């Protein structure tokens, strides 16, 4: 999980606490992936576990729990999430394990990430298309998913002031947070990274 590739090696010798080997060939090159972050309002444990597992399998490189006005679950067990991320990385044969940040307020997230490319799950927009031209190649992509009950009006206004923001409606139905996250990451991966 060092992001440098995968190698095959021949063991030359084994002694107490030491294994000497010779690399014979490279099996996989370093992953050359665009960074995809998932900023999300924490949700109930079972649903959060599913969201983290599937988002890891889909290629998310960083998870950022966001505390909003309407966040119900305010404590996140980072150790539990790290275990899920490792298991999902192994299952999906990833070379790099995603990072998980400590929970941060939406206000601080916006302040720290003014130039970030943010694709915002927005129930109030008519936009159902991603435009590659609005995405800066210099910065990571961040999928931003709101809490149960959505962002407050004030929070939505703050989000929409971000420099590289794309509000996106993915469905006419109101989706659960974990469904919205998985759907948005799939859409981003397919449309912008292919």
Features from the language model and the residues they span:
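Structured adenosyl-cofactor binding patch, chiefly the S-adenosyl-L-methionine
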Residues: 153-194
